[in-house]
Amino acid sequence: MDNLQNVLKIGLPKGSLQDSTLELFANAGFHFSVQSRSYFPSIEDDELEAILIRAQEMAHYVELGAFDVGLTGKDWIIETDADVVEVADLVYSKASMRPVRWVLAVPESSAIKSVKDLEGKHIATEVVNITKKYLARNGVNASVEFSWGATEVKPPDLADAIVEVTETGSSLRANKLRIVDTILESNTKLIANKASWNDSWKREKIENMAMLLQGAINAQGKVGLKMNAPKAALQNIAAIIPALRQPTISNLADENWVALEVIVSEKTVRKLIPELKRAGAEGIFEYNINKLID
């Protein structure tokens, strides 16, 4: 194949997801460099070209073929009704490693208690199509207006209710808003253009990227532990290790000793290491994990 064809164009989300996305890619082994005010990140991989673009537009441009692959939310795929290949679920967001929610929210003092109370009301949101479908499913007639941002400030003067995205609900609470219902749970997805997915070289490149990105997500909050232990203490040590699988055990030159290696939750380490030491382990050391491939 001609080398000029061996380029994968990737769309990276600009805005709230940008920093967490670039960090995820770095952990997966893809180190993008973004210059101030530039929308074209560089990377030491001649087979990749990247552009920063808003997640809201990503699925549309991937469908058109402007990008071979991109990252955006399930919400924006639904909102734009984009015809793309959903390659992988990547459960991370701007502030956590969990999905976000699109919720129906009203002022704390509002009489609105359920979606049925929205009959004849006015709703502001960025996800107009998702909101209209939600109202239709519930048999409610209400007007839905596109919001360009700062949606939380619109009730009660500019809207009776809003449909807004949240991770923790803290922004809604700060603006004295109450959640009435969760409309949609969304997470980031790696998506591909259909023609690109049918290209064998591009598909392999995309699948490899998906594997490494998922591995980076799997490794979040995990660390590795290595240690030596006398065989006489092995049973007691193995019993207190909350490993993902059974610990890896290797023989040492001294036939009475073995080496153990495990992957554990980082949250357990401060309790676990003293217990391992008391159980007879020696030479314990902890190391970070960038990727964990199942």
Curated annotation (Swiss-Prot):
Gene Ontology MF term list: ATP binding; ATP phosphoribosyltransferase activity; magnesium ion binding
- HAMAP family, alphabetically? HisG_Long
Which gene is the coding source of this polypeptide chain? hisG
Which ranges of the sequence are coiled-coil? none
This protein's UniProt keywords: Amino-acid biosynthesis, ATP-binding, Cytoplasm, Glycosyltransferase, Histidine biosynthesis, Magnesium, Metal-binding, Nucleotide-binding, Transferase
Entry EC no(s): 2.4.2.17
InterPro entries with a match to the protein in the record: ATP-PRT_HisG_long, ATP_PRibTrfase_cat, ATP_PRibTrfase_HisG, HisG_C, N-reg_PII-like_a/b, N-reg_PII/ATP_PRibTrfase_C
Q: What is its cofactor?
A: Mg(2+)
Pfam family of the protein (one): HisG_C
Q: Which reaction does it catalyse?
A: 1-(5-phospho-beta-D-ribosyl)-ATP + diphosphate = 5-phospho-alpha-D-ribose 1-diphosphate + ATP
Q: Which compartment or compartments is the protein found in?
A: Cytoplasm
Superkingdom in the source lineage: Bacteria
User: Per its record, how is this protein called by name?
Assistant: ATP phosphoribosyltransferase
